[in-house]
A protein has these predicted regions:
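Catalytic Zn2+-binding segment of zinc metalloproteases
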Residues: 116-131
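Metzincin-family zinc-dependent endopeptidase catalytic domain
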Residues: 3-119, 145-149, 159-162
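Residue-level preference for alpha-helix termini and adjacent loops
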Residues: 56, 70, 125, 136, ...
Length: 171
């Protein structure tokens, strides 16, 4: 839910209050990603380790008619691998066999927010990770202030993999 509603800040800055709201569908509603009446986050039991955010839009106006996030089961395993590999040198929590729920929850929130970006029509912005110099990413003051390793949620730079044990950064 929070990964969806993280977009509220951007919409409010553009003048749209409550533009995107995440709600649990009632049990009486059977909706899936093919039902144009609902925009849903759909869990798919699959060996695939990914997520995606497709949308249907009116080519005449650009209006998004319906948008979904498809969340495959094994995305959790790839997130765990990314956290362990990219932050294990500085993050003691990432060195555990089972990662803490708080760490995995933040990772899932990031992916949900990223995929909602795709549902809103945004493409990857891989140049965003070049916005911050390496020495800044190794600065505890900078990383505490910025709370991010890239200037866009649409980049894949989810974790600070340039931080070194002597930098004092633990995430």
């Amino acid at each position: 839910k929070q990964g969806v509603e993280d977009w509220q800040v951007a919409f409010e800055k553009a003048g749209f209050k409550n533009a995107i709201i995440a709600k649990q569908l009632p049990d009486s509603v059977a909706a899936d990603e093919d039902d144009i009446n609902y925009s849903v986050i759909n869990y798919v039991a699959s060996a695939e380790s990914n997520a995606m955010g497709p949308s249907i839009y009116d080519p005449r106006s650009g209006e998004i008619i319906e948008a979904d996030v498809i969340w495959w089961h094994n995305v959790i395993s790839i997130l765990k691998n990314w956290i362990t590999i990219q932050t294990g040198a500085v993050n003691p929590a990432a060195q555990q066999c089972l990662l803490p729920d708080s760490l995995m929850g933040d990772a899932m929130r990031f992916v949900a927010c990223h995929e909602i970006g795709h549902s809103l029509g945004l493409r990857h912005n891989m140049i965003a990770s070049a916005a911050y110099p390496t020495d800044s990413l190794r600065s505890k003051t900078f990383t505490n202030k910025m709370k991010s390793t890239a200037s866009s949620i649409m980049d894949y730079a989810r974790y600070n993999y340039v931080a070194q044990p002597g930098d004092g950064i633990t995430e």
